[in-house]
Amino acid sequence: MFGSDDSGCHVMDDDVAPPANGSKAVTLLLRLITLALALTSAVLMATASECTIYGLDGATATTVTFKDYQPFIYLVGSNIAATILEVAAIYVQVGKGDDVEDAPMIPRVVLVVVDVAVQMLLYSATGAVFAAVMAYGPQISACTGAAGHFCEQVQRSKIISLAASLSAVLAAVAKDVALPCSVWPHPSS
C-alpha cells in the first residue's frame, strides 16, 4: 500500500534497483548548456552594432561591423554549426538506448564524432576571435566610445564562446564517467 512504508520511499515490486543514469542526465544538461551558449555567442556577434569611426580631419568616416573581420564571421558560422551538431547529439543521446549493454554501436560512434567536431569548431573559432581581438585591438577599441556597443558585444561573444567550449569538453567527459546517482525518469527494463 502507498504510504505504509516508514522509509518514505517508494518500494519497487521487483526489488531490483534501476541502473544509475546520472551521467546521462549530466551529459544532457551540459549539451543543452553548450547549445545555448554557442547560439548566444553567435547571435551576439552577428548582431554586433555598427560603429562609425571618424578620422582626424572629421570628414573621413569608416563603418565597422563584425563582417569586416574574418575571425568574427568564422565564429558565427562555427558556433551555428556547433549548435546544429549539439541538437543532433541531444537527439541521438535521448533516442538511443545506451542503458543496455547490447545497444547498437553506431549511435555511440556518432556521439564521439559529434563531440570531437563540436569541440574543434568551438575552440578554433574562440581562439581565432581571441587572436583577432589582440591583433585588431586598436580598431575594435576605437568603437568603445561610439553609440553602438560593438566592442562590448565582441568581448561578451568571445567569453560566451569560451564558456561553450568548456561546456562541450565537460559534456564529452561526463558521458564516459559513471555517476552513482539515478535521476528520474528511471530507464525502463
From Swiss-Prot:
Pfam families: CASP_dom. Keywords: Cell membrane, Membrane, Transmembrane, Transmembrane helix. It is found in: Cell membrane. Disulfide bonds: none annotated. Residues 46-71, 131-158 are extracellular. Residues 1-24, 93-109, 180-189 are cytoplasmic. The keyword Zinc-finger does not apply. InterPro entries: CASP/CASPL (IPR006459), CASP_dom (IPR006702), CASPL (IPR044173). The chain crosses the membrane at residues 25-45, 72-92, 110-130, 159-179. GO terms for cellular component: plasma membrane. It is a multi-pass membrane protein. Homodimer and heterodimers. Belongs to the Casparian strip membrane proteins (CASP) family. This is CASP-like protein 1U2. It comes from Sorghum bicolor (Sorghum).
